[in-house]
């Protein structure tokens, strides 16, 4: 009786720790021989009807339980002398407290099932192999949830790498793609230093953006918000698109200026470009390089130079006094060095302001002789046409001073006309 009570006392904590998760499956453990005559487990060689290896592996994978899981469906029967040894072997690899039987005893159970020929009495050989279990430190939480405990330990052991996380850029790109319905390009794996994804605009969006750019180069914020709502884009995308488009426009204008250099210009096309570029140069928007004077034939430049042109009637006398100088200097005996050095501040402005250098009117007209200086009545640039004609009415034949009009305040006009006389070398020196 005392022996049975002792066995029951040993059995009760184990029964409280390990509930029906391991005991309610008699079919799985039916292969183990249990002799009711001696109340002991069949570990001797004639009593080893172990399941086949597939069944054993299924037991290992499904129920990575303790060594006590070998018990059959009648756990309340007090086993004899080997029951204490098994319980001891369950408790020994654990932490030493009452929960060690359920928690830290999983590795010995696996080893005892994987190595059936070993008898259980030498348990000290089993604990060294316990660290081979990958979840050895985790499963001491709940002894009764065998499969649940293993799955929870598997989920806990999952590591979240940085490239798995969703960054702010990726979430914004997903949202914009979903709202705009665009065909987004495949995103590269979003690493910490990944590049910003290029936005793919649809043709309808591009048409609307181009139309808006045609009317307004710079968008105010209310209009930008309106277009963002209209095109299903963000304000930032529209702002960046306009920035890029302005840069492209500037490059196109620069390329046009290089193409329309005086060496490749025709007379009918040069005067408008020359007049426009002359007024822009006088308003101080361009550096003193004559080749760049074509870059900005824009209406605001004309508006800036209008006040200077309206006051030209007062300068008819200096212009008339310039006429003999022009006739005198029109001969080709002048050396070209002031043109290369641009002769100081006002001379650079003269070089830019006059379509003689910029537009190239006189390159074709002055080649025969100095007389064709007076042929410029039909080549007047449009922006200063009204003032030029008033000057020409007062001083007949002086309309060639139209190039002087944008800068009438410079008193030393002789330098200007001498630079006009050196026109035949202008393309060679300024556009090499």
Swiss-Prot record:
SMART domains assigned to the protein according to its UniProt record, in alphabetical order: HOX (SM00389)
Compositional bias segments (type: Polar residues): 148-158
Record GO biological process: anterior/posterior pattern specification; cartilage development; cell-matrix adhesion; DNA-templated transcription; embryonic skeletal system morphogenesis; glossopharyngeal nerve morphogenesis; Notch signaling pathway; positive regulation of gene expression
Residue spans of biased composition, Pro residues class: 116-131
PROSITE patterns, per the entry: ANTENNAPEDIA, HOMEOBOX_1, HOMEOBOX_2
Biased amino acid composition, Gly residues: 97-106
Key words, A-Z: Developmental protein, DNA-binding, Homeobox, Nucleus, Transcription, Transcription regulation
Annotated spans, Disordered: 43-62, 68-197, 253-280, 400-432
GO cellular component: aggresome; chromatin; nuclear body; nucleoplasm; nucleus
Domain of life: Eukaryota
Name of the protein this chain belongs to: Homeobox protein Hox-D3
Organism: Homo sapiens (Human)
